Amino acid sequence: MPRSVWKGPFCDNYVIKLARRARGNPNVLIKIRSRRSVILPAFVGYTFGVYNGKVFIPVKVNENMVGHKFGEFSPTRTFNGHSGDRKVNKK
């Protein structure tokens, strides 16, 4: 279920503080670990490094991302593919 409208979007306070510090320079990578925070309109144009459990993945925020969460743009699992042609052909 989605969040109630009357509560408003959730964003960790330290994410907002880091974005305010980088207000003058939008090219700086803002490293965050909060995948649960919602992308606010004030974050458009900034580059966030979203932690996926191993590395910080750079995410350049644009207008289409507003309202989504940071975790949606940094995958945590890698898919190596299925074996495919390795199967033995029985004759």
UniProtKB/Swiss-Prot annotation:
The keyword Endoplasmic reticulum does not apply. NCBIfam families: rpsS_bact. GO terms for biological process: ribosomal small subunit assembly; translation. This is Small ribosomal subunit protein uS19. Belongs to the universal ribosomal protein uS19 family. Protein S19 forms a complex with S13 that binds strongly to the 16S ribosomal RNA. It comes from Neorickettsia sennetsu (strain ATCC VR-367 / Miyayama) (Ehrlichia sennetsu). GO terms for cellular component: cytoplasm; small ribosomal subunit. Keywords: Ribonucleoprotein, Ribosomal protein, RNA-binding, rRNA-binding. GO terms for molecular function: rRNA binding; structural constituent of ribosome. It holds the Pfam family Ribosomal_S19.
